[in-house]
């Protein structure tokens, strides 16, 4: 999975990146939200892990923009508190998951597994839609051919 990590604290970014890499993720680490958003605009990302409170843009601003740029991105917000944003508001604005500080690395691994499973389901859905489209296209062509033959037979 391609994972973008955004936190204004370098040690946290490093720790998250280390765990994600051990889980097989390709990691894009950032400490500046502007740089992260520029990267999101040009590179497909499967998972966005972002802190809620940062100096330039808060996590919700980043999540909203990420979902605008990449609607299927899975987002995980890490926060120490929710007083500014109730959980319901976070979820309504596109956050897929929330993890509260302090957290254990096993909790992070569980969240990464959930994101990976979701990515797999989305990929499978796209494959099934493509296959369904191909089958329906063939059926329509067959029906159109039958209609042409029936029309020609009546003339």
Q: What are the functions of these language-model segments?
A:
Residues 9-28:
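Two-component/phosphorelay signaling modules centered on CheY-like receiver
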Residues 24-31, 36-39:
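Short hydrophobic/Thr-rich beta-strand motif most characteristic of the beta2 strand and flanking loop
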Residues 31-32, 58-61:
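Acidic catalytic/metal-coordinating carboxylates
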Residues 43-49:
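Active-site beta3 strand of CheY-like receiver
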Residues 54:
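Receiver (REC) domain active-site loop signature in two-component systems and cognate sites
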Residues 61, 82-97:
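Alpha4 helix (beta4-alpha4-beta5 surface) of REC/receiver domains from two-component response regulators
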Residues 85, 103-116:
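C-terminal output helix
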